[in-house]
Swiss-Prot record:
Pfam families: Proton_antipo_M (PF00361). PANTHER family: NADH DEHYDROGENASE. It catalyses: a ubiquinone + NADH + 5 H(+)(in) = a ubiquinol + NAD(+) + 4 H(+)(out). Keywords: Electron transport, Membrane, Mitochondrion, Mitochondrion inner membrane, NAD, Respiratory chain, Translocase, Transmembrane, Transmembrane helix, Transport, Ubiquinone. It comes from Metridium senile (Brown sea anemone). It comes from the Eukaryota. Belongs to the complex I subunit 2 family. It is found in: Mitochondrion inner membrane. One of its GO terms (molecular function) is NADH dehydrogenase (ubiquinone) activity. This is NADH-ubiquinone oxidoreductase chain 2. The chain crosses the membrane at residues 12-32, 34-50, 66-86, 112-132, 161-181, 200-220, 227-247, 268-288, 291-311, 354-374.
């Protein structure tokens, strides 16, 4: 009798669909193509999140992501319908040109349809970025999904959504409000977390606050700084999730890292430096990404937001330093000793080692020679503008 399929055979195809949708989203200039490019990775991620057979957490995560994702897609379509119906076209540059060249009041005498449509579209895109106040799904979905799917969900789709947000620009200070909420929620929400993937979910929310801040400022330099921040966030997240996957904790608890420095010293120092970089501790690369965003904010007189960003970064640094403390200075409890005794010890395979090594090398290389990253970000920002 043939054993039932676990669904793993379709995983490579679904991952490629996520990558394809994100690539198409970066190059899309029509609202219909934007919608299709957003839904292609979203539908693939619905399946990937819930594909862990026999896991109630995975099924719950998939259901939450499906329901809330469908709601966000509906809001996005409604916003597109309002703008396209108002202007008679679907091209993003043409719609912006019509609404910004003096014909907006003639087409929309009430002055209500245009801002409502823009708000609905922006809100749906903020959901895809897991930015506050549209972040409620992220911790549960990140925790319930398989680690490889969580890493994919936390990185690849956000790059394409970033490009669309840059194209439509800031809308009625919505991005500024999302920036403030994301920084505060991300910093405070992670303080009491005991699971590493939930902590990384709140960390991602806080980082999206910095990315949105650069888009809200709206200048070439600030968008370039946001793009650099997004690239470095993706690299650091890939390294962090790869190490979580390689360590293979039974419960994905943060305290499972205790004693790692004695058993796997190379992994311990890599994990510690990665989390310190995510925290923005100098002279690691995460510090420079935050510095460039802060510099843009101060240059354009966002003083209060700059102070809030510094405070939230300090608060967020507490739980990253706590992880380093657990890695180096905390002994195993009896509960953890029992868990690790029951767990079969696995060697890290070549693919995971290569992924960890490549991402960590990029983090180190960009500290020594950031010129290549700055030049690539400059060219990419020119294309976005």
């Amino acid at each position: 009798m043939t054993p039932p399929s676990t669904g793993g055979e379709a995983t490579p195809v679904l991952v490629l669909m996520v990558a394809l949708g994100s690539i198409l989203l970066v190059s899309a200039s029509n609202w219909l193509s934007v919608y299709l490019a957003i839904e292609l990775p979203t539908l693939s991620l619905f399946i990937l999140v819930a594909q862990k057979r026999g896991s109630g957490f995975s099924a719950e995560a998939g259901l939450k992501y499906f329901v809330l994702g469908a709601l966000a897609s509906g809001l996005f379509l409604f916003g597109c319908a309002l703008l396209c119906g108002l202007t008679g076209g679907t091209s993003i540059p043409c719609i912006d040109l019509v609404l910004n060249q003096g014909r907006g009041p003639a087409l929309d005498p009430s002055g209500v349809i245009t801002p409502i449509g823009s708000l609905l579209i922006t809100g749906a895109l903020l959901f895809k970025l897991s930015a506050a106040p549209f972040h409620m799904w992220a911790p549960d979905v990140y925790d319930g999904a398989p680690t490889t799917t969580t890493a994919l969900l936390a990185t690849v789709p956000k790059v394409g959504v970033f490009s669309i947000l840059v194209s439509i620009g800031p809308v009625a200070n919505v991005l500024l409000i999302a920036t403030i909420f994301s920084m505060v929620v991300g910093a405070l929400g992670a303080l009491n977390q005991t699971k590493i993937k939930r902590l990384l979910a709140y960390s991602g929310i806080a980082h999206m606050g910095f990315v949105l801040w650069g888009i809200e400022i709206g200048t070439f330099e600030s968008v370039q700084a946001s793009l650099i921040y997004m690239i470095l966030y993706v690299i650091m997240s890939v390294c962090a999730f790869a190490m979580v996957l390689a360590l293979g904790g039974l419960k994905n608890l943060i305290v499972e890292f205790s004693g790692l420095s004695r058993k796997e010293p190379a992994l311990a120092i890599t994990l510690a430096l990665t989390f310190l970089s995510i925290a923005g501790v100098p002279p690691l690369i995460g510090f420079f990404s935050k510095w460039w965003i802060l510099l843009s904010g101060i240059t354009y007189q966002y003083y209060l937001v700059s102070i809030l960003a510094v405070i939230c970064s300090v608060v967020a640094g507490v739980y990253y330093v706590r992880i380093v403390k657990i890695i180096y200075f905390q002994a195993d409890s009896f509960f953890l000793v029992g868990l690790k005794t029951l767990r079969e010890k696995k060697r890290i395979n070549f693919r995971k080692s290569l992924l960890i090594g490549a991402s960590f090398y990029l983090m180190g290389f960009m500290i020594i020679s950031p010129n290549l990253l700055l030049q690539l970000a400059h060219w990419a920002t020119v294309g976005l503008f």
